[in-house]
Amino acid sequence: KVVESVIVRQPSFFSGLGQLLSNFDAPGWSSWLQWHLLSGSAPFLNKALVEENFAFFGTTLSGTPELRERWKRGVSMVEGVLGEAIGEIYVAKHFPPEAKSRMLELVHNLLEAYRVDIAALDWMTPETKAKAFEKIDKFTPKIGYPDKFRDYSALEISPDDLIGNIAATTKFAMDYEFAKIGAPVDRSEWHMFPQTVNAYYNPGMNEIVFPAGILQPPFFDLGADDAANYGGIGAVIG
């Protein structure tokens, strides 16, 4: 498809790349690319390479004394490449639809409280208040998990080809991003997985995102009364 324009966040990267390519050194680039391929693959190769790679990048450069257990590294890797698939399983067990409904009600009530507070401000002009109310009207709360999970059906995974799986998931992720070029902005997209214990406010989209991972005790508990939940996650959001 023909794309007339794109947003480039770091134009200097492309000008610098152009200068490098103008003096193209094929053997040098080949060596550089081979090194990056080997370095990027090292954490997924044999035990000796994994440990040697960690000794330099983990301990020498970052000061991390010990390599994490293999199963923990495996979980992190799978979560990184299949995050929403893992998230769908997580919310089925830890965040039922009732929890999402109750959280949406909580956020709605907080927004209504903002309206009351803004209306009572004597230092804010009517025009400014109108803009504030307009922002509240357009505010988007994303709670727990996306309404539609990402479709991974086109991704082929083999149980006996780790490096091949890494390559396949990398390509899948890149294709997903490239497909956005020239397409309308997907305002329903999440930039955190449901199982993530964190949250964020995106001012550009005027949205808050609270994944199911952080909507657990002590912040939020479906079995607790409103006082506990408004004093917990309500205080964080407000």
Please annotate each region the language model reported.
Residues K148-I163:
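Charge-dense polyanion-binding interfaces
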Residues M103-I118, A132-I143:
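Short amphipathic alpha-helical coiled-coil/interface segments
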Residues K1-E105, N109:
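Noncatalytic, helix-rich "gating/capping" subdomain that lines the substrate-entry/channel surface
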Residues V8, Q34, P159-G231, V236:
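Active-site-adjacent "gating/activation" loops or surface patches in catalytic cores
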Residues K1, I237-G238:
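Short, intrinsically disordered, charge-balanced linker/junction segments flanking boundaries
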Residues A120, I143-D151:
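Amphipathic alpha-helical coiled-coil segments
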